[in-house]
C-alpha cells in the first residue's frame, strides 16, 4: 500500500481519522499513518519539517506563514465541516440570546475564540462581554462551571462535551452559527500534492467514504473506531457511539468550503495574527480532487450506496 502520514493534535478528531484510515486501507490501497504531534508549535512546524504529509485540523496559522514565505507553499484541500460547531448554553431562566446583553459569556481559551466573538457580534451581542477560561482552571471543556457558579450567564460548549453541562441544568440557547472551516480541515505542502496527485485523489476518496460511513452506517463506523489502534483500553463504547452520532450531523459529503466559510476563517486568522491579512485566502485552497470526485459521480454513487437500506 502507498503510505501517507496524517498529523493531528486533538483526540476528539480520532473517530473521523480512524474511519479515514480504515476506508483508505480497505478500498483505496492507501496506508494512512496516523501521527499525533504536540505541542502546537511542533504541530505547526510538522508539514515543513517532514514529520507528516497532511494535517487534519488547525489551518489558520498557514495564512500568516504564507504572507511571510509563499502563498503557494501549502495547499488546503478538504473541509468536511462548514461551521464553528459549538453551542451556546445557559440556565433555563435565559430564554433568548438577546437576554445576554451586558452579561458575561464564558469562552474556552483553546481553539478559536475569535470565531465565537464573530458569532456574538453577528447576533447583536458585544464580544467584549466575554471571559476566556483556560482548561487548566476548570478542567477540559468544563467552562460551564462558570455559569453554575454565577460568574457567567452563558458558555460556548462543544456538543461532544456538553453532557456534564446538561446534567448541571444548562440548556442549548439558539444562536446562529457562521460558515467557517470547522473540524477536520486538511492541508498539505503544494509540492507534495503536485508530486502525488493520484495518491491525493485516492486519499480524498477515503475521506468521502469515511464521511458517508459515519453519516449513513454509524454502527459500522463504531466497529471501525472500537477496533482502531488509537482507541484506548477503557474507552466507553456507548460514549463513542454518542460522539459518532454528533459528528455525523456536522459532516458534508462534498467536503469543500463555501467562499463565505473561507472568508470568515481568514478573518479569524487575521485576528490571531495580523500578518494573515496580506494573503488572498482563496489562493491556498484547491478544489481539484473534490471536484473530480463530484464530477465523476463518485460522491453521489457512494452516498446512494451507503444510504440505501442494508
Model-predicted segments: where are they?
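Conserved C-terminal helix/tail region of periplasmic/extracytoplasmic solute-binding proteins
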Residues: 270-310
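Short glycine-centered helix-capping/turn motifs at secondary-structure transition points
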Residues: 21-24, 50, 150, 169, ...
Amino acid at each position: 500500500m502507498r503510505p501517507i502520514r496524517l498529523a493531528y493534535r486533538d483526540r476528539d478528531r480520532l473517530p473521523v481519522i480512524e474511519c479515514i484510515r480504515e476506508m483508505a486501507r480497505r478500498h483505496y490501497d492507501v496506508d494512512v499513518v496516523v501521527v499525533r504531534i504536540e505541542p502546537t508549535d511542533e504541530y505547526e512546524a510538522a508539514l515543513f519539517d517532514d514529520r507528516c504529509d497532511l494535517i487534519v485540523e488547525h489551518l489558520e496559522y498557514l495564512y500568516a506563514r504564507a504572507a511571510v514565505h509563499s502563498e503557494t507553499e501549502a495547499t488546503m484541500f478538504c473541509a468536511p465541516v462548514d461551521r464553528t460547531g459549538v453551542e451556546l448554553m445557559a440556565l433555563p431562566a435565559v430564554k433568548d440570546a438577546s437576554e445576554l446583553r451586558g452579561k458575561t459569556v464564558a469562552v474556552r481559551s483553546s481553539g478559536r475564540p475569535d470565531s465565537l466573538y464573530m458569532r456574538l457580534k453577528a447576533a447583536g451581542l458585544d464580544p467584549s462581554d466575554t471571559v476566556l477560561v483556560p482548561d487548566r482552571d476548570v478542567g477540559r471543556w468544563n467552562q460551564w462551571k462558570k455559569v453554575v457558579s454565577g460568574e457567567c450567564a452563558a458558555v460556548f460548549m462543544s456538543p461532544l462535551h456538553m453532557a456534564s453541562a446538561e446534567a448541571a441544568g444548562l440548556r442549548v440557547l439558539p444562536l446562529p452559527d457562521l460558515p467557517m472551516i470547522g473540524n477536520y480541515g486538511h492541508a498539505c505542502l503544494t509540492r507534495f500534492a503536485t508530486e502525488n496527485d493520484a495518491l491525493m485523489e485516492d486519499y480524498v476518496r477515503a475521506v468521502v467514504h469515511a464521511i458517508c460511513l459515519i453519516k449513513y452506517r454509524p454502527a459500522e463506523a463504531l466497529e471501525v473506531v472500537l477496533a482502531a489502534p488509537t482507541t484506548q483500553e477503557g474507552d466507553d463504547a456507548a460514549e463513542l457511539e454518542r460522539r459518532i452520532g454528533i459528528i455525523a450531523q456536522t459532516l458534508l459529503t462534498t467536503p469543500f468550503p463555501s467562499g463565505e466559510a473561507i472568508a470568515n476563517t481568514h478573518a479569524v486568522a487575521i485576528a490571531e495574527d495580523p500578518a494573515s491579512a496580506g494573503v488572498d485566502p482563496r489562493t491556498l485552497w484547491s478544489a481539484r480532487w473534490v471536484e473530480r470526485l463530484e464530477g465523476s459521480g463518485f460522491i453521489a454513487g457512494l452516498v446512494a450506496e451507503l444510504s440505501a437500506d442494508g
